Amino acid sequence: MILLALPNKGRISEPINKILDKAGLKISARGRSLFAKTVDEEIEVMFARARDIPEFVADGVADVGITGYDLICERDTENSVEFLLDFNFGKANLVIASPEDSDINSINDLKNGMKIATEFPHITKKYLESKNLDLEIIELSGATEIAPFIGVADLISDLTSTGTTLKLNRLKQIDTIVKSTTRLIANKKSMVDENKRLKINQITSGIKSVLYAQTKRLIMMNAPKDKVNEIKQIIPGMSGPTISEVLSNDKVVAVNVVVDEKQVFKIVSELELIGAKDILVLPIERIL
C-alpha cells in the first residue's frame, strides 16, 4: 500500500487534484475524511496541511507527497526526502522586503540586531547566517506585511508571486531567499522497497505524462499529397508527422502531428499557405 499525502486546501490543491484525475488516479469523494481511496486499490490518499507534508514524507508517515519547495526547506527536510518531479507551477519567491520609505535598499544595509518578521523562521535564519547577519526573527502566522508599520519589525521575509501584494502594502523587495515551485517528493526508505518504488514510479510517470501533454497540441489535417515534403519541413513533430492515405481522394493525405503549443499559431498559418484543409488543433490528455 502506498500513502500519498496531498494538500487539504490552498491554491495548489485543486490543480493537483485535476492533474491526478487526468493521470487516471481518480480520488473518491472524501467529504470531511482525512483519507480517501483511489481507483488503484494499492494507492490511498491522505489530506494534510501543505506545510506538514514534508515532515510526514521524511518520517515515513506517507510514502510520497506533493507540496511546495519553500515548505520542504522550512521543515529542513530537503536532504531527507527524494525529489521526483517539479510541477513547475505554484511558483513563488520567499523574499526580504522593507518599507518603501526606509533606508534599507539591499542586503548590505541590514545590521545585526534588526528585527525581521516572517512565517518562515528556519529558512530566513539559515539565509541570514549565510550572510553573517544576526537579526532577531519575529515569527508570525499571517499578515506579515503589516509588521514594519506597527513597530513589530524593521523588515519582513514573505512569499510573493508577482510582487503586487508587496507594492500594495508599500514594501520593496531587497533580496530573494529561495525560489519555490510545487514538488513531488518521496520517502527514501519507500524508494528502496522494490514494490513501493514500482508503484511510486507509476504515480510519477502518470503525473509527468499529464504535465508534458499540457505543453503540446495534436494537429490533424488533410493536405495535398505533393506537399508532403514541405509539410515535413514545417512540422517535424515529436517523431515526425504521421501521414496516411485518404481513400476517397488519392491526391490528398491525412496528417497527424504533435507539436509544442507555442508553435501552433505559426505552424497552422504556414500549413494553410501550402493548401492544408480541415485543420484541427486538439488538446492532449497524456503523453507517455
UniProtKB/Swiss-Prot annotation:
<dbReference type="GO" id="GO:0005737">
    <property type="term" value="C:cytoplasm"/>
</dbReference>
<keyword id="KW-0328">Glycosyltransferase</keyword>
<dbReference type="Pfam" id="PF08029">
    <property type="entry name" value="HisG_C"/>
</dbReference>
<dbReference type="GO" id="GO:0000287">
    <property type="term" value="F:magnesium ion binding"/>
</dbReference>
<dbReference type="InterPro" id="IPR011322">
    <property type="entry name" value="N-reg_PII-like_a/b"/>
</dbReference>
<keyword id="KW-0547">Nucleotide-binding</keyword>
<keyword id="KW-0963">Cytoplasm</keyword>
<protein>
    <recommendedName>
        <fullName>ATP phosphoribosyltransferase</fullName>
        <ecNumber>2.4.2.17</ecNumber>
    </recommendedName>
</protein>
<dbReference type="GO" id="GO:0000105">
    <property type="term" value="P:L-histidine biosynthetic process"/>
</dbReference>
<keyword id="KW-0028">Amino-acid biosynthesis</keyword>
<keyword id="KW-0368">Histidine biosynthesis</keyword>
<dbReference type="InterPro" id="IPR020621">
    <property type="entry name" value="ATP-PRT_HisG_long"/>
</dbReference>
<dbReference type="InterPro" id="IPR015867">
    <property type="entry name" value="N-reg_PII/ATP_PRibTrfase_C"/>
</dbReference>
<comment type="similarity">
    <text>Belongs to the ATP phosphoribosyltransferase family. Long subfamily.</text>
</comment>
<dbReference type="GO" id="GO:0003879">
    <property type="term" value="F:ATP phosphoribosyltransferase activity"/>
</dbReference>
<dbReference type="InterPro" id="IPR013115">
    <property type="entry name" value="HisG_C"/>
</dbReference>
<comment type="pathway">
    <text>Amino-acid biosynthesis; L-histidine biosynthesis; L-histidine from 5-phospho-alpha-D-ribose 1-diphosphate: step 1/9.</text>
</comment>
<keyword id="KW-0808">Transferase</keyword>
<dbReference type="GO" id="GO:0005524">
    <property type="term" value="F:ATP binding"/>
</dbReference>
<keyword id="KW-0067">ATP-binding</keyword>
<dbReference type="InterPro" id="IPR018198">
    <property type="entry name" value="ATP_PRibTrfase_CS"/>
</dbReference>
<dbReference type="InterPro" id="IPR013820">
    <property type="entry name" value="ATP_PRibTrfase_cat"/>
</dbReference>
<keyword id="KW-0460">Magnesium</keyword>
<dbReference type="Pfam" id="PF01634">
    <property type="entry name" value="HisG"/>
</dbReference>
<comment type="function">
    <text>Catalyzes the condensation of ATP and 5-phosphoribose 1-diphosphate to form N'-(5'-phosphoribosyl)-ATP (PR-ATP). Has a crucial role in the pathway because the rate of histidine biosynthesis seems to be controlled primarily by regulation of HisG enzymatic activity.</text>
</comment>
<keyword id="KW-0479">Metal-binding</keyword>
<dbReference type="InterPro" id="IPR001348">
    <property type="entry name" value="ATP_PRibTrfase_HisG"/>
</dbReference>
